[in-house]
């Protein structure tokens, strides 16, 4: 019987390594796919590990710049903070992983793709909805969801099948990281009353260990895109990683969040997003300077919907594409410089300037240079308040009657 091909999203961890053996038993040839999303680790060994475990082919693709420009950038411009806190670190990477799974599957003539998600997380939804949107004819296999093993049973299976056991298996935490940030759950973090231990963090310093002097950074934007940091031009992925180090040193971007998952449960996770939080803060301030009032007041409603769509795995939905078009239109004049003070866990904007600034000092000042027409206020107030005045007159007459 001829074996079918399946492309597996491979991380090098226990779950996806065991999945290779499990899929082999189901008569599949496995093609492993690992993506470098900017987690800051050497992933060459992951490619080789997949082959040693049993994959017939293994890909390791650097997608950092694609992730930065086509995924993280939109999240920054839309100020995506799920439930006001979470910058969608993991949610942003899933549609890109799904896209590459489909591309490799079509290239290799595979009939199926597979992922290592459990049956109680958001990621299974994000992967499978994205894959269905890109190629509805591919079979999607979720080994971890299907086998329903305990951790002990999974380890026993790995030992029986000579699957290497990761040296960090005794770590209580489940971690996902890319250049937009780091998420951490499980272990003591499952108790929402327990303070996160310091070893739960990697990208940021504790406030007690941060410098006692602030550091200032100037971020340059062109049409809504961060392009320079302290006067130096960077590709977006490098700018984000550089800012991660700068802001992380000052403890910026630590987030402790009890969130409402898509699958109906609450979970407690700890996030580190130093660059994401700094860029979102700076970008919002530049928009305040350059967007007209009507757009500035309407855009947050669109941002909320974009955030929900991304969190819920609907990156490739028609609505998300339509809202993205609106978002891009708003960014044409978001060009300028923002000065940010990094200090003791805070990214504080202390200055902003733009050639497209709608702030006119001669209209705003209270000095002798004031050019605002104060006499125009009388007529404006009369017309602006007229509906309220008429309503009051009518209802007072009824009361008197």
From Swiss-Prot:
It is found in: Cytoplasm. Keywords: Amino-acid biosynthesis, Arginine biosynthesis, ATP-binding, Cytoplasm, Ligase, Nucleotide-binding. The lineage of its organism: Bacteria, Bacillati, Bacillota, Bacilli, Bacillales. It comes from Bacillus cereus (strain AH820). One of its GO terms (biological process) is urea cycle. Its main location: cytoplasm. HAMAP family: Arg_succ_synth_type1 (MF_00005). This is Argininosuccinate synthase. Homotetramer. L-aspartate binds at residues 118, 122-123. Pathway: Amino-acid biosynthesis; L-arginine biosynthesis; L-arginine from L-ornithine and carbamoyl phosphate: step 2/3. The keyword tRNA processing does not apply. It is an enzyme of class 6 (ligase). It comes from the Bacteria.
């Amino acid at each position: 019987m001829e074996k079918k091909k399946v492309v597996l999203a491979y991380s090098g961890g226990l779950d996806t390594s065991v999945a290779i053996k499990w899929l082999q038993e189901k008569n599949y040839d496995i093609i492993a796919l690992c993506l470098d999303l900017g987690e800051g680790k050497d992933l060459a060994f992951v490619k080789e590990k997949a082959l040693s475990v049993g994959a017939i082919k293994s890909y390791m693709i650097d997608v950092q710049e694609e992730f930065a420009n086509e995924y993280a950038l939109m999240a920054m411009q839309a100020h995506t903070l799920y439930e006001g806190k979470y910058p969608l670190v993991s949610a942003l990477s899933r549609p890109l992983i799904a896209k590459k799974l489909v591309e490799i599957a079509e290239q290799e003539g595979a009939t199926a793709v597979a992922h290592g998600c459990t049956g109680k997380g958001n990621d299974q939804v994000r992967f499978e909805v994205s894959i269905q949107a890109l190629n509805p004819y591919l079979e999607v296999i979720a080994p971890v969801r299907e086998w329903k093993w305990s951790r002990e049973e999974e380890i026993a299976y790995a030992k029986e099948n000579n699957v290497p056991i990761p040296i960090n298996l005794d770590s209580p935490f489940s971690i996902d990281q890319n250049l937009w940030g780091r998420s951490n759950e499980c272990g003591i973090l499952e108790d929402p009353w327990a303070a996160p231990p310091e070893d739960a963090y990697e990208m940021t310093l504790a406030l007690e260990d941060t410098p006692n002097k602030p550091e200032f950074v100037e971020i340059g934007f062109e049409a809504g895109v961060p392009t320079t940091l302290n006067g130096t031009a960077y590709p977006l992925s490098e700018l984000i990683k550089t800012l991660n180090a700068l802001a992380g040193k000052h403890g910026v971007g630590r987030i402790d969040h009890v969130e409402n998952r898509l699958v109906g449960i609450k979970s407690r996770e700890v996030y580190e997003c130093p660059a994401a939080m700094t860029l979102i803060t700076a970008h919002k301030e530049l928009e305040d300077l350059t967007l007209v009032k009507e757009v500035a007041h309407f855009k947050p409603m669109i941002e909320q919907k974009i955030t929900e769509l991304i969190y819920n795995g609907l990156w490739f939905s028609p609505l998300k594409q339509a809202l993205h078009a609106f978002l891009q239109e708003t960014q044409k004049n978001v060009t300028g410089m923002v000065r940010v003070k990094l200090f003791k866990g805070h990214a504080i904007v202390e200055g902003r300037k733009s050639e497209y600034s709608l702030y006119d000092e001669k209209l705003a000042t209270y000095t002798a240079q004031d050019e605002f027409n104060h006499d125009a206020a009388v007529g404006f107030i009369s017309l602006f308040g007229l509906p309220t005045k008429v309503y009051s007159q009518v209802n007072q007459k009824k009361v008197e009657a």
